[in-house]
Every structure is written in structure tokens, then in C-alpha cells.
Amino acid sequence: MKKASRSVGSVPKVPGVNKTQTTEKTKPESGSSLSAVTKLSKPGTSASLLKTKSNDDLLAGMASGGGVTMTNGVKAKKSTCASTVSSTTGTTMSTLENKPRTVAGSTARRSTSSGTKESSSSRERIRDRSRLSQSKKLPLAGQGSNDTVLAKRSRSRTNPESDIRMSKSKSDNQISDKAALEAKVNDLLTLAKTKDVEILHLRNELRDMRAQLGLNEDQVEGDEKSEEKEAIVVHQPTDVESTLLQLQEQNTAIREELNQLKNENRMLKDRLNALGFSLEQRLDNSEKLFGYQSLSPEITAGNHSDGGGTLTSSVEGSAPGSMEDLLSQDEHTLMDNQHSNSMDNLDSECSEVYQPLTSSDDALDAPSSSESEGVPSIERSRKGSSGNASEVSVACLTERIHQMEENQHSTAEELQATLQELADLQQITQELNSENERLGEEKVILMESLCQQSDKLEHFSRQIEYFRSLLDEHHISYVIDEDMKSGRYMELEQRYMDLAENARFEREQLLGVQQHLSNTLKMAEQDNKEAQEMIGALKERNHHMERIIESEQKSKTAIASTLEEYKATVASDQIEMNRLKAQLEHEKQKVAELYSIHNSGDKSDIQDLLESVRLDKEKAETLASSLQEELAHTRNDANRLQDAIAKVEDEYRVFQEEAKKQIEDLNVTLEKLRAELDEKETERSDMKETIFELEDEVEQHRAVKLHDNLIISDLENTVKKLQDQKHDMEREIKNLHRRLREESAEWRQFQADLQTAVVIANDIKSEAQEEIGDLKRRLHEAQEKNEKLTKELEEIKSRKQEEERGRVYNYMNAVERDLAALRQGMGLSRRSSTSSEPTPTVKTLIKSFDSASQVPSPAAATIPRTPLSPSPMKTPPAAAVSPMQRHSISGPISASKPLATLTDKRPSYAEIPVQEHLLRTSSTSRPASLPRVPAMESAKSISVSRRSSEEIKRDISAPDGASPASLMAMGTTSPQLSLSSSPTASVTPTTRSRIREERKDPLSALAREYGGSKRNALLKWCQKKTEGYQNIDITNFSSSWNDGLAFCAVLHTYLPAHIPYQELNSQDKRRNFTLAFQAAESVGIKSTLDINEMVRTERPDWQNVMLYVTAIYKYFET
């Protein structure tokens, strides 16, 4: 009997073993004694164990809904608890031994812990036989509970700190979860208090009944144990029902949280995949993070029951370097810390509530502090190390997240810029294609007209041959125009061949383009058909998925109905237990009556009655044991069904998520296909519109062709008229030849006179230049002498002002006389130079020659620049010069003006070469101002002028029989030559189009230089410009420009006087932006950015920043 009652009563004490596993792992030597003490503790401790059972079951249900890693930890805990219970209960709880132990035996750590637990359970069986040893070991239970309370309190102190640090990233979710957990804890505390009140009430009633019966103390203790076990058995079904309801509610809530976390996980995965980041690059960081979180194996082993081992199990079971591990690690560290905090708070509060309800014997039998002194210190040190590790991991995670955000923003900016450039390029290609088609149509029309013209030409050639034959028959002499036959005719024929070849080549190209377009149209139609087929298949698959979901829902309802049936059976078993309890009470009353009869009356009848009662009692006990076994079976079945329901729900949820994901993917593909179909339809409509436009153009070209035919007929009539005029002109040409011979003699005489005039002019020019050089040299010497004399005068004045006034006055008079003599000499030389000029006839000849060979332009009549005046191209622009530099530059310029005016106030003939007089053309072929030759190079210009005059003499004297029209044609052909030799004439059409494109879009040349897109090319240019500048790292056009230093650095390379870059810092943003924008506005770059907005935002609009930087590049580089 006692054995059976022991087996029945040992079932609900499983949570006690589960509760004390943390202390068993920290102190394995005292683990067996603690488990033995918790088995045979007082009713108060049993009640507290019952409450901890309900709490642990509740937390295990919460952890089972928290994800795969939490369920692994809970299954391992259940398997270890089942092994310890099966070793203590024996054959009655053999069903618990049949639970799967694969999770517990997967790792060596769990196998060793199960072995120690089996050895401790064997020790417990040996210690069960002696009460004395059990009563001695009783104080260890109080110490174990105190140790667990201390460990949990220290855990609850460290974990909220880590929670506070982790809650900075996910504050909203954690606040809601914390509020829900606090509400659950409050409910559990109220439930525990009500049950404690009921237990105290029942204990008082039991003691009153025992006092009324007057039983012995041994029997009281045995009855206490039996009644305690029965009370636990009675209260268990109600606890099972309440915990089932609570677990269901919590399971649904935690499933919702799990779905939210999975959605967030999926979103983060998609973002990482979109950004192109792989976890292999961050494998070292992830391994360090895992190492930090599993620094000491004792901490993970001690926190295994609280969910601390989930991270290590997930790390051991997952492949290193996968994307899912990184995201699940971050989320599970947050969730595990949160759950462990809630569990520790709940355990600590429950232990504080249950401490006043324990008996005074436990408080008196508490062990000394030397036995349990090391455990809290070890726990605190380990918690401190884990807190530091969590801080390091949080810092690593925040830094990694910041880097990922920066990379994401720069890649998003680059993608947007690339998309804009692609849209621009697509528009340009469309325009070019339309222009190409228009040119092709025009070339087709030109080819048709060319073919018609060639036919007409053949017809006219046949007519000409016919007319020639007629002329030969009638013996009429005719003159063939050599010019018509040779140059112009060959050129037209060559152009005709080139046009025909180009037309044939472009016709082949257009045919290829047409074939390509037809192929693309066919492919688009085929893709459309495939898309429609895929849409139908996806719809069918969607219907199939819906049918599968309906079947799963039906199976779920069936499982729920079976669960309700099992609940009904449990309720019936509970009613039966209540009936048996009442019967047992009735039997106890009978036993009490029998004892009273035994004390008063006959003993033989009482012996018979006792035997009968003993038999009835044995039958009742066997019946109770069988009912207990049936109840255990039903509980196992209920647990098995609940696990099956959880698995089915997990599978259903996974299946539903996969179905939703597939449906979303199918919807995305459907939208893509619809968009492609719309694009194809728009292209088709555009092609139809282009066809209609081409037909209209064909009609217009036909009308133009008719008009051209009319014009050709008119031109034929004019050709006939021109032929008549040609004969008249030939007669006039003969007369002109005769006149030309007469005038050629006069022209030769004029050339001889002109040669003499040129020689005289060159001599005059050389003499004048020599005299000007002598005058300049003498003036320079006089100025030097004057400077020396003034210096000597100042020195003499400083030394002897009062003594040497008269001497200085005489000396100055002498100097003035010398200067007057010099001035008189200069005047004589000028008069002599003017008197040595040629006669007015020579001047008139030179002027008439200049007027005949040049068309004067107002731009060329400007005052020439003196040799000492600075070149206009050498002066720096106003943009790159500060105001002080402008003053310093304008000083020597103004000082050099009087010197220039002294030397020469009019242009001299020596500074203009003779070939420029002879070959000077109109203003279109010459720049506005001609460069003048300095006086230092007068000898070179004289030699060049003489050489050129000799060449002109040879050229003029060579063609004796030439007509004056050839010389007159020199002025007309020279502009063509100058145009062909000009730099703009040598530019090909492709370079002209490129220059036009660069003027329109300045970034195109930059993109060709650096390669890639325009945005990346401009970014590389900015990086190249800001090399060597501190505190600047340009990686994008948003966050790299938010402090203004990048603008200041770029503008400092061009305008160093406007921006004091060494005095700037990144903190004073407004000053940086103000300096940069003012410097840009000073050279004419308008500010398109708002200073207040740039100062306020950390990430300004990258498009506005890029436009402003483009304006800077366009101003300074193009």
C-alpha cells in the first residue's frame, strides 16, 4: 500500500526536480540530496513545488511558441526531467521513460548530465528507506531554494541592464512584450495567492479533523503524506485544465509574435539580398559574436532551463556564415534576454511569495554560509562577463547596421542615378532612331530622284550623240567644252557613285533593322503567350493551395474535437476520483467506529470486520492505482495529442507562409508580365502611329516629287536659254581675249613700277625701325642716368642740405641742359626721319595696294598692343583672384602705360609683315586683332618682309601670259584657303556633334574619361579634386556633403583666396555652406541649395547636390 501511494504521489513532484536543475549544475555534489529533500518536504514546500510546476509549465509553453531554438531547449528539459522521474518512480511511470531521448542524447554534455541524474536518482532510492537521513538532509532544500533565489536575483539584476541596452533598437516591440509579460506575471501571482489561501484552509481543516479523531503522531504523519498526495492528485486535473487554457492563449499570442519576427527577418533578408551583401565577408565578426555569447560553458549550462541554451544550440545546429543565422541570432538574443528576464522576475517573485509560507523548521535548519558562499560570487562574475560580451556584441551590431545603412543609401543613390541616365539614354536612342528613320526615308526619296536624274542624263546623252551625228553629217564645226567634260563632270560622277554606294549600304542596314524589329515583335508575342499560360497555371496552383488549406483546416477541427473528447474523459475521471475520495472518507469513518467498538467490545467480531475492511481497502487501493494509471495514460495521451496539434499547427503555419509567399511571388510575376504586356502594346501603338506618319510623309514626298518634276522641266528650258547665252558669251570672250592681250603690256609696266615702290617702302621701313631702336636705346640710357642722378641727389641732400645747395643747383642746371640737348637731338632725328620719307607718289601707291588687297574691318583698326604691355591672355580671370591680388596686378599695368605711350603712339609699318599686307582677307578669315611683332624682333621682321617681297616679285614676274583676272582671283581664293587651314574647318562632323553634346551635357565627356555612369564619373572627379584634404570622404552625393567641407574643398582648388580651408571644421556647418555658396556666387554660379535645409538634414537630396556640383564642374572645367 505504501509503495503504491508512493508511486502515486511521486508523479506531481517532477517540477521540483526541474526547478532545482540550475543548482545541480553548479554544485553536482549536493544535487542528489536536494532532489531527495524536495521529494519528502513539508506540505508548504510541496505546495510551492506545485506552483513552480504550473509556472514552469507555463513558461515552457511560452518557450515552445517562441521558435525552433526555444522548443529544442524545452524538449531537452522535458527529456531530462522524464529520465529523472522514471528512475525514481519505478514501474508505475514506465510510460514516461518511453518519451524520445534523441534530443537529450544528441550532445555529450546532455548525456553526461543525464548520467549524473540517474546516479542521483539511485542515491535517492537508497535514501528513501531511512527517514533519519532524509530529515538530516532537509535543511539543504532551504539552502538550494536560497541559492536559486540568489542566482535568479543576480540574473534578474544583470538581465534588465542588458535588456535596457538592447531595447534601444527595438523599444516599441519590447515595451509591448514587457507589458504583456507583466500582466501575465500579475495573473499568476494572484492565482498563486488564492491557491495558497486554499491550501492553508485545507491544512487547518485537516488538523482539526485529526484533533477530533485523536490519532497518533505517526499515523498523523502517514495520513498527512497520503492526504497530501491525494490533494495533489485532486488538484492536478484542475491545474491541467487551467494550464492548458493559459498555454493555448499564450501559444496564440507567441505565434503572432513569431510571425511578426519572421516577417521582419524576411524583410531584412530581402534588403540584404537587394544590397548584395553576403555573410561570408562578416564570418569573422559573427564567430567573435558567438564566442562572446558563449564565453563560459557553465553559464550556458546554468541558464539552460531559462532558455539561455537556445543560442548555443542554434549556433551548433546551423551552418556557419548563412544569412539566416545572422538575422536569427540578433532577434533570438533579444527575445531570449527578454524571456529570461521575464522568467527570472517571475521565479524571484514567486520565491519571495512562498518564503513566508514555509515551515519554521526549514528556516531553523538552514545550513551555514560557508557551504553556499561561492555560488553567488561565481554567478555574479559570470553574469558580469556575459554583460560585457553583450555590450561588445551590441556595439558590433550597431556599427555593422550603420555601415549597412550607409552602403544601402549610396547604392540606392547610384541606382537612382543609373536609372535616370538610362531613361535619358533611352530617350536619346528613340530620338536618334526616329531621325535615322527620317534620314533613311529621305535617302530613299533621293535615290529615286537620283535614278530619275540618271535616266534623264542617259536620255540627254543619247540626244547629244544624236545631235553630234547630225552635226557631223552636215559638216558643222562645234567646240567641246573641256571644263564641262573634265572637272565638274568627274566630280558629279564620283558623288553619284558615293551616293549610290551609301544608299545601298543604308538600305541593307534598314532591312536588318526591320528584320530585327520583326523578330523582337515575334518574341514579344511569344513571351505574352507564355505569360498567359503561366498566369493560368498559377491560378490553378492557387486553387489547389486553397483546397489544401481547407483540408488542413478540417483536420485541425477534427483534432480539436478529439482534444475536447479527451478533456471530457479527464473531467469524468476527476468526478470518479471525487467519488472515490468520498468513499475513502466514509471508510475512514467506519474504521474509526470499528476502533471505538474494538476498544469497548468483542475482539473476534472486530477482527473479522477488520479483515473485511482491509480487503475492501486493498480493493479500493488497487482500484485507485488503476485509476491513477489510467489518468497518467490519459495525460500522456493528452500531452501527445497536444504535441501533435502543435506540430500540425507549425506545419500548417509553415505551409500557409509558403503558400502566401508563393502567391506573392506569383502576383509579382503577374504584375511584371502585365507591365511588359502594356509596354508591348504601347510599342505596337507607337509603331502604328509611326506607320501612319510615314504614309503621310510618303504622300508629301510624292507631291514634292511632282513639284520637282515641274521645276526640272523649267530648268531644262532655262538650260536651253543658257546654251544660247553661252554662244553669246563665247563671242564676248574672244573680244575680251583681245582686250586682255592689250592690257597685259600695261600691267607688266605697272608691276615693274610696283616692285620699285615696294623696294623703296622696305628701305624706308628698315631705316625707320633702326632709328626707333636707337631712340629707344638712348631714352632708356637717359632714364637710367636720370634715376642714378636722382639717387645721388637724394644722398647729397641728406648729407649736406645746407652746404651744397648752390652746387646742386648748378649741377641740376647742367643736367637740364643735357636733357634739353637730348630732346633737341631726338627732335632732329624725328625731323630727319620724316624728311627721309618717300614722295607722296610712293605713299599713294602703297595705300592703293593695301586697299586693293584687303577689306578693312573695324575690329582690325584697333590701337596695337605695345611690346611692354601685358598680354591679355596672361592676366588671371577675376574669379580666381582676390581683391588684394587684383590691386597688385593692376598696379604694374597702369605704370607701364606712360612708358608705352612714350615709345610708340601709332602703328609703325615695321611691325606688320608684308605678306600680311598682300594676303590679308576679309574679317571672317582673320581674328579681331592681329598680333604685333615687338621692336626687339625688328630685324627678323625686316628679313621676312624682304624675303616675302622677293617671292612676290618672282610670282608676279613668272606668269607672263596670265590675265588680270588671275590676280583678282587671288583675293577670292585666299579666304577659302584660310578657311580650310583654320582649326574649325578641320573638325569632322563627329567631333562637331561631340562638342555640341558636351556643351549641352557637360558630364558626357567626364563619363567618357572615367568610364561608367555620369554620376560615378562626377563622383570620381570630386574624389580626385579633394585628394589631400582632411576630414573628407566622398562616397555619395547625400551624407558626404552634409557638413559643407566637401563644397569648400572643391571650390578651394579653384578659389583659394575666398575660402580659408585650414580654419574650417565639420561642426560649424552653416559657416562652411555660407563660405562655399558665397564663393560660387562671386564667380556667377547661382546657389540652388538652401542653407537651412542643408544644415538641418543629415541626408540632403542627392539630386539637388549633384546638380549644384555639376554647375561647379561646368563653370570651371568646360
Swiss-Prot record:
InterPro entries: CH_dom, CH_dom_sf, F-actin_Monoox_Mical. GO terms for cellular component: cytoplasm; filamentous actin; gap junction; microtubule organizing center; spindle. PANTHER family: CALPONIN HOMOLOGY DOMAIN-CONTAINING PROTEIN DDB_G0272472-RELATED, CYTOSPIN-A. It comes from Gallus gallus (Chicken). Belongs to the cytospin-A family. Residues 79-119, 359-373, 937-946, 972-991 have a biased composition (Low complexity). Residues 193-281, 396-450, 488-808 form a coiled coil. SUPFAM superfamilies: Calponin-homology domain, CH-domain. One of its GO terms (biological process) is cell division. The lineage of its organism: Eukaryota, Metazoa, Chordata, Craniata, Vertebrata. Residues 1-176, 299-324, 359-391, 856-879, 921-1002 are annotated as: Disordered. Residues 1012-1117 form the Calponin-homology (CH) domain. Pfam families: CH. Residues 120-131, 158-171, 947-957 have a biased composition (Basic and acidic residues). Involved in cytokinesis and spindle organization. May play a role in actin cytoskeleton organization and microtubule stabilization and hence required for proper cell adhesion and migration. May interact with both microtubules and actin cytoskeleton. Transmembrane segments: none annotated. It comes from the Eukaryota. Residues 29-52 have a biased composition (Polar residues). Its main location: cytoplasm. This is Cytospin-A. It is found in: Cytoplasm, Cytoskeleton; Cytoplasm, Cytoskeleton, Spindle; Cell junction, Gap junction. Keywords: Cell cycle, Cell division, Cell junction, Coiled coil, Cytoplasm, Cytoskeleton, Gap junction.
